[in-house]
Amino acid sequence: MPQMIPFFFMNQLTYGFTFILTILFLTSYVFLPMILRLYISRLYISKL
């Protein structure tokens, strides 16, 4: 059914954008501060 192709692509695009935004949000708010705290604590311990 060629009528469904634009809806399929819009659905795929919408879910792709939400997936990318979710990954970006999780990376920026969860993983990056965790890595930064780990790096700062290693730096602080090595200076002792």
UniProtKB/Swiss-Prot annotation:
InterPro entries reported in the protein's UniProt record: ATP_synth_su8_fun
Statement: the UniProt record of this protein carries the keyword Ion transport: yes
GO biological process: proton motive force-driven ATP synthesis
Pfam families in the cross-refs: Fun_ATP-synt_8
Gene name of this polypeptide: ATP8
Assembly behavior: F-type ATPases have 2 components, CF(1) - the catalytic core - and CF(0) - the membrane proton channel. In yeast, the dimeric form of ATP synthase consists of 18 polypeptides: alpha, beta, gamma, delta, epsilon, 4 (B), 5 (OSCP), 6 (A), 8, 9 (C), d, E (Tim11), f, g, h, i, j and k.
Membrane topology: Single-pass membrane protein
Family: Belongs to the ATPase protein 8 family.
GO cellular component, one term: proton-transporting ATP synthase complex
Transmembrane spans: 13-35
The entry's keywords: ATP synthesis, CF(0), Hydrogen ion transport, Ion transport, Membrane, Mitochondrion, Transmembrane, Transmembrane helix, Transport
Functional note: Mitochondrial membrane ATP synthase (F(1)F(0) ATP synthase or Complex V) produces ATP from ADP in the presence of a proton gradient across the membrane which is generated by electron transport complexes of the respiratory chain. F-type ATPases consist of two structural domains, F(1) - containing the extramembraneous catalytic core and F(0) - containing the membrane proton channel, linked together by a central stalk and a peripheral stalk. During catalysis, ATP synthesis in the catalytic domain of F(1) is coupled via a rotary mechanism of the central stalk subunits to proton translocation.
Name of the protein: ATP synthase protein 8
One example GO MF annotation: proton-transporting ATP synthase activity, rotational mechanism
Native species: Eremothecium gossypii (strain ATCC 10895 / CBS 109.51 / FGSC 9923 / NRRL Y-1056) (Yeast)
Subcellular location: Mitochondrion membrane
